[in-house]
Amino acid sequence: MIRQKIAVLGPGSWGTALSQVLNDNGHEVRIWGNIPEQLDEINEHHTNKRYFKDVVLDEKIKAYHDLEDALKDIDAVLFVVPTKVTRLVAKQVSQILDHKAVVMHASKGLEPGTHERLSVILEEEIPNHLRSDIVVVSGPSHAEETIVRDITLITAASKDLEAAKYVQKLFSNNYFRLYTNPDVIGVETAGALKNIIAVGAGALHGMGYGDNAKAAVITRGLAEITRLGVKLGADPLTYSGLSGVGDLIVTGTSIYSRNWRAGDALGRGEKLEDIERNMGMVIEGISTTKVAYELSRELNVYMPITCAIYQSIYEGKNIKEAITSMMSNEFRAENEWSK
């Protein structure tokens, strides 16, 4: 593939890891963010120690303070910013971008209030003449492993197969591989909702439960993710793929997962405000829990795990009581995933 100019919006852990992948593939990478000290550190020391203490980045990766400079003559732009600011950043991009580019995002969440997926936000805020169909980059991936070039397989989802194939070629190499998928709804809902289940799995660990309980939450969590996703128009097969069960396994079982760690701390009795302050990173599963709970009520979708996490976070119910109370729910058949 010919060398491409890529703006990566968001110098967090995943944005930094994906920047390295793109740089390894010979592309010009421009990272943009809003913390001057962090951007200066990337340019002067080639490190991002807030997320990776022992990683030295290639000096060809440049960080930009000015969004206009980062977007100049780009071939593609990758959004890796928190869900809550995606719309704001997209508005800024639409005011600056003066030519058509491939628009991608690698964030996982649903917008509070509107309940919208991130690709929908980008479609609303960036005019058609400035972008391709949105490409979603999602799947089972810890930034801590990708940054050290561990083997990682994820998904490029788009309604436009050619745009998805472009992104597939853009990122793929001998340690990082993408598969295309036309089911944008399925890929995005899987990526967002698995964070809730990861909080639940972490909470079980924090409360001292074993592998049996964690496996139950993960598999029944997949069932309720699928129920809501299908109601929203997703293909149920997507949830058995990389962006579905794959991402759920990686996020629901690992200490690298900030959502799992948040759940673990909740399970040990820590207060949410203390957890968020100590972690110093966005815990998408917290805000997504509220959105998913509201959607489940609106669409009449049975989501008991999401409901239990919601009750604990937003209604003050004891986390152990909220989760263990599910054991007395009405009996159901396992294959009632669609109800």
UniProtKB/Swiss-Prot annotation:
Annotated catalysed reactions: sn-glycerol 3-phosphate + NAD(+) = dihydroxyacetone phosphate + NADH + H(+); sn-glycerol 3-phosphate + NADP(+) = dihydroxyacetone phosphate + NADPH + H(+)
Location(s) in or outside the cell: Cytoplasm
Pathway annotation from the record: Membrane lipid metabolism; glycerophospholipid metabolism
Free-text function comment from the UniProt entry: Catalyzes the reduction of the glycolytic intermediate dihydroxyacetone phosphate (DHAP) to sn-glycerol 3-phosphate (G3P), the key precursor for phospholipid synthesis.
UniProt-listed PANTHER family: GLYCEROL-3-PHOSPHATE DEHYDROGENASE, GLYCEROL-3-PHOSPHATE DEHYDROGENASE [NAD(+)] 2, CHLOROPLASTIC
Similarity remark: Belongs to the NAD-dependent glycerol-3-phosphate dehydrogenase family.
This protein's name: Glycerol-3-phosphate dehydrogenase [NAD(P)+]
Organism of derivation: Streptococcus mutans serotype c (strain ATCC 700610 / UA159)
Name of the gene this protein is made from: gpsA
